[in-house]
Amino acid sequence: IYEISTGKCLYENAMDEELVTPILNFLLTRDIHMDAFIGGKGYTPIQCVETAQKLTVPSSIKNYIITTRTRLDNILQFIHENQLKVQKMTLNFYPAADGTLIDRETVRKFLVSNPSITTVCGGYNNLEFTRADANKGVGLRKLAEILGVNPDATMAIGDTENDLAIIEAAGIGVAMGNATDAVKARADYVTTTNTKDAVSYTH
């Protein structure tokens, strides 16, 4: 949780080097694109740059991924030498000739077998993982505690699997009109889609 005006980190529950190193060692053998979020900034192994060009996500998202990350020659060395913790990893995949996403299922099975992390999809068939006890719902409750707000007085809006925890934690959970069926099923309300000003929509 960051204070936007100052950039100050108010709360963090990140993966330490001991947890993330064996996972990264495996991921670095796969033909995927990965981002590590450390201290609120995104870092990408240099070998993933070419893979980023092959992603089939919308061009705006691809451009964001390519232009906003710091590229690292050796991400493991960077983490070790600076004694850093990783807040979240985001993985993106590109399709083979038959349309299947290369290495996605292999990576998914590897990640979900690790009880120390939580793995979800954040959209466009990506995979994201954090510590098992770190998710948006935990973050919302911690923010409410910091602000002195009753969690029942909060509202959260989301559309994909990585929003389920925060929708369930909020006093009022709202699903976007373009949300997955699972998100809509857990929400208290469903608004319009993200192309129709859904957040500002009034029921």
Task: Go through each PLM region and give its residues.
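Alpha-helical substrate-recognition element adjacent to the catalytic core
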Residues: 1-24, 31, 40
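Short secondary-structure transition/capping segments
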Residues: 5-7, 47-50, 132, 165, ...
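Conserved active-site and cofactor/substrate-binding residues in soluble primary-metabolism enzymes
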Residues: 18, 135, 194
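Acidic, Mg2+-coordinating phosphoryl-transfer loop and its flanking beta/alpha structural elements
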Residues: 140, 153-187, 192
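Conserved small/polar residues in nucleotide/adenosyl-binding loops
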Residues: 202-203
